């Protein structure tokens, strides 16, 4: 995994240099209600995340991240380690009830049906929706106080991510009032170079290319499928020299990719119907296996899943590549938020929820999660060298393989 993660990290950072600013953000249940506190006064923290999106432990003997600043290995799940850390630091027991969902839309539907969580990890567009609809509990005033020893998020978050969350607002309030970043990345096309050329994969129009009928997968969520559709519909314009060289390129790109006019929405719906007839499937997670088994030759992927897919292919001795469409890419964020209905005025639960976010933001834990799931953390480490050492470790692994 190390070689591929290193390459994708470089790719994401390179894309960031191109699409920073406005375009960087735009792309430019009803179950039984759980009690908040158990009978023995253990704090119950209900966390909902995406599938395969946190270190679950049980690493193999070979899975050791040997950094200059020390070795890192996931023996326990990061959830178990948090529960132990919280008791050691705050003298109170906490039990995380952890569950997973597949899409932002599924998450929203479950919330509207009455399912209760304390901490969830939606994507940026769903964070904005939940903020606008007053679902979210704001962070405590001291959450961003860098003088507090355990405020690892405030001390370690990437300056770019901090600026993005501070400057983007809903109803006059910054994202950072309600959300802390977790992972981020770009979208693109994973493809089999024996079946698909780099040129064919480097455009959103591949999703409707009849040459690959029933051999390509598309993301099964509104934001990503519509983004790809807009990129394909407006491909010629977005790739034109006059458009790219325009002095207000970023603003124009954001305007084109966020065009919600009735005419454009109608075009998108019509186009996605043709894509549905061409694609193998609209999916959330299955494309990773479908690419590895050869059922499909290309798939629209988040960069973290691209890392996993290419790594698994490498273990089976065949190559998969990742292409960023020339039109533009979508730079996305997932972030941790607290729900008002879950916290419900309980100060102990709120402290546990914020501590969970801070624990995940420890540089060592950010590295564990990056290594395990393949995505790029929003944590750059602040004064800690751990994240930087991890990047060096990836690059050196890449260089070592190139020399052999």
Per-region residue spans from a language model:
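Bacterial N-terminal signal peptides that target proteins for export
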Residues: 1-12
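Sec-dependent signal peptide cleavage junction
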Residues: 18-40
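Early extracytoplasmic/lumenal segment of secretory-pathway proteins
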Residues: 37-129, 133
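Extracytoplasmic ligand-binding site segments that recognize negatively charged/polar headgroups
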Residues: 46-65, 69-75, 125-278, 282-286, ...
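Short helices/loops that flank or line small-molecule/ion binding pockets
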Residues: 80, 84, 105-117, 132-133, ...
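Short beta-strand and adjacent tight-turn residues that come in two discontinuous sequence segments
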Residues: 101, 122, 218, 282-283, ...
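Extracytoplasmic/periplasmic substrate-binding proteins
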Residues: 277-345, 394
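Mature extracytoplasmic/periplasmic domains
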Residues: 338-404
């Amino acid at each position: 995994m190390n070689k591929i993660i290193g390459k994708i990290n470089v790719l994401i950072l390179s894309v960031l240099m191109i699409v920073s600013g406005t375009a960087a953000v735009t792309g430019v249940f009803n179950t039984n209600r759980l009690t908040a506190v158990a009978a023995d006064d253990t704090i119950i923290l209900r966390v909902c995340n995406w599938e395969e999106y946190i270190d679950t432990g049980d690493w193999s003997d070979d899975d050791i991240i040997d950094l200059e600043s020390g070795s890192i290995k996931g023996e326990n799940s990061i959830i178990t380690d948090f529960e132990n850390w919280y008791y050691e630091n705050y003298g109170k027991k906490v039990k995380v009830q952890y569950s997973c969902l597949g899409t932002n839309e599924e998450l929203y539907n479950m919330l509207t049906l009455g399912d209760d969580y304390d901490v969830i990890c939606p994507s940026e567009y769903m964070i904005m929706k939940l903020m606008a609809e007053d679902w979210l509990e704001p962070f405590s005033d001291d959450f961003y106080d860098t003088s507090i020893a355990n405020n690892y998020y405030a001390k370690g978050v990437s300056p770019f991510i901090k600026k993005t969350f501070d400057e983007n607002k809903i109803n006059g309030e910054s994202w950072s009032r309600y959300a802390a970043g977790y992972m981020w990345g770009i979208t693109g096309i994973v493809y089999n170079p024996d079946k698909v050329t780099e040129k064919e994969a480097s455009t959103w129009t591949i999703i409707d290319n009849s040459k690959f009928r029933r051999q390509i997968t598309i993301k099964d969520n509104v934001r990503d499928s519509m983004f790809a559709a807009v990129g394909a519909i407006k491909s010629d314009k977005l790739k034109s020299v006059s458009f790219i060289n325009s002095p207000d390129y970023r603003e124009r790109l954001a305007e084109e990719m966020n065009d919600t006019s009735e005419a454009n929405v109608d075009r998108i719906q019509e186009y996605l119907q043709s894509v549905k007839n061409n694609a193998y499937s609209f999916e959330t997670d299955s494309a990773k296996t479908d690419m590895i088994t050869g059922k499909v030759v290309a798939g629209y992927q988040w960069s973290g899943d691209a890392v996993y897919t290419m790594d698994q292919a490498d273990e089976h001795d065949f190559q998969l590549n990742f292409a960023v469409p020339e039109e533009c890419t979508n730079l996305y964020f997932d972030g941790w938020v607290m729900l008002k209905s879950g916290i419900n005025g309980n100060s102990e639960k709120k402290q546990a929820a914020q501590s969970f976010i801070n624990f995940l933001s420890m540089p060592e834990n950010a590295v564990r999660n990056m290594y395990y799931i393949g995505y790029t953390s929003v944590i750059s480490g602040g004064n800690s060298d751990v994240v930087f050492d991890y990047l060096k470790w990836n690059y050196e692994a890449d260089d070592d393989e190139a020399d052999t």
